[in-house]
Amino acid sequence: MSQVDAEGVVDGLRRTYISGKTKSYEWRVSQLKALLKITTHHDKEVVEALRADLKKPEHEAYVHEIFMVSNACKSALKELHQWMKPQKVKTSLATYPSSAEIVSEPLGVVLVITAWNYPFLLALDPMIGAIAAGNCVVLKPSEIAPATSALLAKLLNQYVDTSAIRVVEGAVPEMQALLDQRWDKIFYTGSSKVGQIVLSSAAKHLTPVVLELGGKCPTVVDANIDLKVAARRIISWKWSGNSGQTCISPDYIITTEENAPKLVDAIKCELESFYGKDPLKSQDMSSIINERQFERMTGLLDDKKVSDKIVYGGQSDKSNLKIAPTILLDVSEDSSVMSEEIFGPLLPIITVGKIEECYKIIASKPKPLAAYLFTNDKKRTEEFVSNVSAGGITINDIALHFLEPRLPFGGVGESGMGSYHGKFSFDAFSHKKSVLKRSFGGEVAARYPPYAPWKLHFMEAILQGDIFGLLKAWLGWSS
């Protein structure tokens, strides 16, 4: 895509937006229903595309992507009328007599750039919010998941209003051509490195952004818990969650020296229960997305500070781009595997003398997108929530805060900015416009020249909401 082509796409959408077409409730509903049809009429095609890109199991394709998009569409359709209604607010003495409300206004023409790890979900989920809010949208799917990208382009062109919603496929040149345009908002999901490029491009036009990035998400495992349940839940979003290629996947575990051997045994047992003795042959595990990421992952294992810390797994199959679930015990904190986001099927376990030492370790790294704690101790839960700064926290499970549409999902610090899901998606793509209405009555002479001391006292009382002070000023009493 050339600069001219990108300008043409944006100009066309800008004309559609100015026409007011996308602002109506009816248009928004029609487009949300179109997205819903894609999930119900073309689910098998989506499964096949995800299998082609990631060897994603059918179960994960439905649970982690198709059902999530379907539920987000249904929720938006159910709640949209309420979301669009102006929000009444009380007014103060300073504006009496008046009424006031907050009106949700679409931003205009927005750009959604998506990631490859959940290429169907991460494309359509933010789009649902953008459409519900009444915007025109350009979707740039990830070229690293080409089958899903091509399918999205085909289905969206078939189902949605292409005068208001466009798909632009391609790689770096196409993305840069898009970033050079003036947008009313950019929503990006992906790596921090590319996030910096997006933010820099947006700054040229003072364009607001939502950045959904990542980080090293810690999982703290306390003693005296049900280790079998904890192990199963950790596995469910580490290895059963796209082979660890998930931004909120557990990146490393912190537990006590005494608890570590028992935890390792519990995870080993459940891994073999899920994937058998030879997990590389299991059809229930996704592959690594491409050879570059595969080499990065095996390179982490080849680090001298890591290679002798493998207590389970470590095998790989380059021909199928698969790496077995791998547990690393007591790796050095200055090792490569503890210095960067893993984003794969390797799970380091850090041991400490006391569980409270976890806070120092977590605080030594950039703020993560998510953090997890397994414990039966209510006080420890309160301490964890208070002491750990993260995009979101789940206690005694993994990633479930992501599934709750009434919770905002987003990062903090280097793990991202802004949030979405449910009404938070609608709000992310809306401007909250303040509207105050008055009649021609209720004139206050103290507002206007010529100024006098009593007028100053009168205005002070009004602005402070001081009825007694107002009366004193009216009667000319000095304070």
From Swiss-Prot:
Q: Does the keyword Plastid apply?
A: yes
Task: Enumerate the subcellular locations listed in this protein's record, separating them with semicolons.
Answer: Plastid, Amyloplast; Plastid, Chloroplast
Chain positions recorded as NAD(+) binding sites: G190, S191, S192, K193, V194, G195
The protein's UniProt keywords, in alphabetical order, are: Amyloplast, Chloroplast, NAD, Oxidoreductase, Plastid, Stress response
**Is Cell membrane given among the entry's keywords?**
no
Give me the Gene Ontology terms describing cellular component. Answer: amyloplast; chloroplast
- Tree of life domain: Eukaryota
Q: Which Pfam families match?
A: Aldedh
An example molecular function term from Gene Ontology annotations: aldehyde dehydrogenase (NAD+) activity
Briefly, what is this protein's role?
Answer: Oxidizes nonanal, propionaldehyde and acetaldehyde in vitro, in the following decreasing order of reactivity: nonanal, propionaldehyde, acetaldehyde.
Protein name according to UniProt? Aldehyde dehydrogenase
